[in-house]
Amino acid sequence: MGVAYIFYNTGIRRRTDMKVGFIGGGNMASAMIGGMIQKGVVSADDILVSVRTEKSVERLTNQFGVQATTENEAVVAGSDLVFLAVKPNQIKNIINLVKNFISPEKIIVSILPGKSLQWLGTEIGKPTKLIRTMPNTPALVGEGMTGVCANDLVTEEELQLVLTLLKSFGRAEVVPEYLM
């Protein structure tokens, strides 16, 4: 499948053939989703979010017009790129639930503090395209600064795509993982 890019007057390009998933729909995920939609990087129709409660499903659907569910597996299965946006103490159980749905071409992006690329790779248990990010709280108002690092399976084009998504709610820079 080819990749089509559309350039908007914001200077951000949009990949039109991609589904973006979020496991977790709290404050940071909501800031990211809002920025991506507002900047036109991803349409609401192309965003899938899994959350723990039906109340959160309703909130995200009403607030952003995204597809929301309580099924983490459905988000991973239906997305090309998945943001892990949950609390660090929840991630091990979530990975165990969804790892069978992670295929070699999927990109997994973590916003979890304290969980290295190596740790994530070990938990998933198979070669996976992994990107680790560290967004900060000004992202909640579109002024964030996000540190980014990736494993060797992520191509330069894929890394640039993720940087484009992250820049929709502030700035993003590639840094060595030890600085994160």
Can you say where each PLM-predicted feature lies in the sequence?
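Short, Lys/Arg-enriched N-terminal segments with co-localized hydrophobic residues
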Residues: G2-D17
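NAD(P)+-binding Rossmann beta1-loop-alpha1 motif at the extreme N-terminus of oxidoreductases
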Residues: R14-Q63, Q67-T70, A77, E143-G144
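A structural micro-motif
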Residues: M18, D45, V66, K106, ...
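Hydrophobic packing within well-folded, soluble alpha/beta domains
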Residues: V20-F22, V82, V109, V162
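A general structural signal for well-ordered alpha-helical segments in protein cores
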Residues: G25, A29, V57, S79, ...
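Rossmann-like NAD(P)(H) cofactor-binding subdomain of soluble oxidoreductases
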Residues: E54, Q63-F64, N72-A77, L81-V148
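Internal alpha-helical scaffold of NAD(P)-dependent oxidoreductase catalytic cores
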Residues: W119-K129, M145-M180
